[in-house]
Amino acid sequence: MYIFIKGEVLFGEKYMKKIITLSFCFMFIVLFEQSEAQSTDDVTFDVIGVQLYNEFIPCVGGPDFNQENVDKMMKGWRALNISDDLLGAWGYVPATDTSRFDNGWWELSWESKEAADAAWAQWVQDEEAMAFLAENESVMVCNGEERASWDFTFHRDVYSFGPMSEDGSFFTEFFPCKYNAGKSSDDLMKSIALYNKWLDGLDATSFYAYGIYAGDGTDELADFWWGNFHENSDGAAAGQASWLETGGEARASLEATATCGVPEVYNSGVIYDPSVPEFSKS
């Protein structure tokens, strides 16, 4: 999001562990991209307004952490008994040395909390999976017990500004946001409508998509996170400049609705996508 930034908002205390920075970079394929034969209209229908249950898991790189070992581990992980209810999984790597967090993240996407909880219950009882994770602790460890969950929704066609770059790379900004006094998700939806109208007027062809990670009201530091997905960091900078210059009514509405902290920025990529052979179960 091209949004007004005021102050600084942090994640919850349990996510402030100082752990080794992940440095891998996976290829990114949008979660709902089904195949080259599927039309953009199909993708749009599948994505817009669909509420998903997404989880973020903090991960630590070990002494044997390198690209070759990570690739091997990911291939092995996709060969395990992964739940059919898992819609997708992504890796996030801090893009700057000034990130609040030294750790990387896995994001898992599900249709519901019930589906996620059922899959986790089966996963921790899977002896083959537990043995695999133990064997790869020197490469990477992800702490499932520390996962955080959010209701995620796309509010615009992810391809409205064109396709991803050919190599699949993209750049992510996560803005932690707190509703201003008297404001709520209803006000945010009105602001989003104005934001989409503003986006419609842009003369831009660089890939850009965004989504909202809504909290359950129990986090004192962030009511929701706004996720920006750009083609690259240059695209993010250009978008921010355009927003500050021409945001107008949409910008005023968003700033009146919520105050958002300095974003966390990441190089990101797919770990699992059941619709893409290279990243599906093997």
Can you annotate each of these PLM segments?
Residues 15-17, 282:
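Universal eukaryotic N-terminal targeting presequences
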Residues 1-15:
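Short, Lys/Arg-enriched N-terminal segments with co-localized hydrophobic residues
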Residues 19-29:
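Sec-dependent N-terminal signal peptides
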Residues 29-35:
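C-terminal segment of classical bacterial N-terminal signal peptides
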Residues 36-134, 138-282:
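Short S/T/G/P-rich N-terminal loop/turn motif that feeds into the first structured element of a domain
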Residues 11-13, 22-23, 254:
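Composition-driven detection of intrinsically disordered, low-complexity segments
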